[in-house]
């Protein structure tokens, strides 16, 4: 079942975060995931999300976890987590009951 990684965060240290995007792009490309949306000026409808929102599409939740836990991603994830404040979730695609 298709799964989505959704991250919403505020950048707290722009200089520390700056190398993250160029480093993550080739890792994402190697997984075959699809970047559905990425916005540095997210507009809140409810609550207090960060200004950055990213939505990634994976073939399955297992594929999403494989990317997240891969040695390649784990080597750079700190560039995001150390320099931002926010959330990231991995969710299954929803299909209405028949």
List PLM regions with ranges.
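Short S/T/G/P-rich N-terminal loop/turn motif that feeds into the first structured element of a domain
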Residues: 1-52, 59-69, 74, 92-98
């Amino acid at each position: 079942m298709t799964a989505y990684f959704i991250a919403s965060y505020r950048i707290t240290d722009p200089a520390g975060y700056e190398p993250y995007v160029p480093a993550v792009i080739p890792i994402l490309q190697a997984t075959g995931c699809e970047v559905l949306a990425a916005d540095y000026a997210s507009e809140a409808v409810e609550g207090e999300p960060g200004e950055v929102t990213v939505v990634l599409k994976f073939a399955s939740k297992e594929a999403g976890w494989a990317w997240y836990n891969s040695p390649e991603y784990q080597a750079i994830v700190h560039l995001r987590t150390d320099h931002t404040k926010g959330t990231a979730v991995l969710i299954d695609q929803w299909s209405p009951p028949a």
